């Protein structure tokens, strides 16, 4: 239930700060958001899949921690990211 390589490459290319940037908070949050959105569609059909739901909650928690880190480091980048991602924070 992960993203395919083309989708990941497109997300990395869109949010990267420089050419080979895969570890910046923006890229990590964008990848986690795509995975979270993918899993939400999965739960529409599989309501009792508690094992995957736990993984979803871990991803949401990790994304929240990355967003809190970015908010403390650089508020402008944080606000730009939540606007581009459509997150309601």
UniProtKB/Swiss-Prot annotation:
Keyword Ribosomal protein listed? The answer is: yes
Q: Which InterPro entries match?
A: Ribosomal_uS15 (IPR000589), Ribosomal_uS15_bac-type (IPR005290), uS15_NS1_RNA-bd_sf (IPR009068)
The cross-references to PANTHER family, in alphabetical order and at most eight, read: RIBOSOMAL PROTEIN S15, BACTERIAL AND ORGANELLAR (PTHR23321), SMALL RIBOSOMAL SUBUNIT PROTEIN US15M (PTHR23321:SF26)
Q: How is this protein organized at the quaternary level? A: Part of the 30S ribosomal subunit. Forms a bridge to the 50S subunit in the 70S ribosome, contacting the 23S rRNA.
Q: Which of UniProt's keywords are assigned here?
A: Ribonucleoprotein, Ribosomal protein, RNA-binding, rRNA-binding
SUPFAM superfamilies linked to this entry: S15/NS1 RNA-binding domain (SSF47060)
Q: Which Pfam families match?
A: Ribosomal_S15
Q: What is this protein called?
A: Small ribosomal subunit protein uS15
Do the record's keywords include Iron? no
Entry superkingdom: Bacteria
What GO MF annotations does this protein's record show?
Answer: rRNA binding; structural constituent of ribosome
Q: Which family does it belong to?
A: Belongs to the universal ribosomal protein uS15 family.
Q: Which GO terms describe its biological process?
A: translation
Q: Which GO terms describe its cellular component?
A: cytosolic small ribosomal subunit
- Function statement: One of the primary rRNA binding proteins, it binds directly to 16S rRNA where it helps nucleate assembly of the platform of the 30S subunit by binding and bridging several RNA helices of the 16S rRNA. Forms an intersubunit bridge (bridge B4) with the 23S rRNA of the 50S subunit in the ribosome.
Question: What organism is this sequence from?
Answer: Photobacterium profundum (strain SS9)
Residues in coiled coil:
none
- Entries under Gene3D superfamilies matching the protein: 6.10.250.3130, S15/NS1, RNA-binding
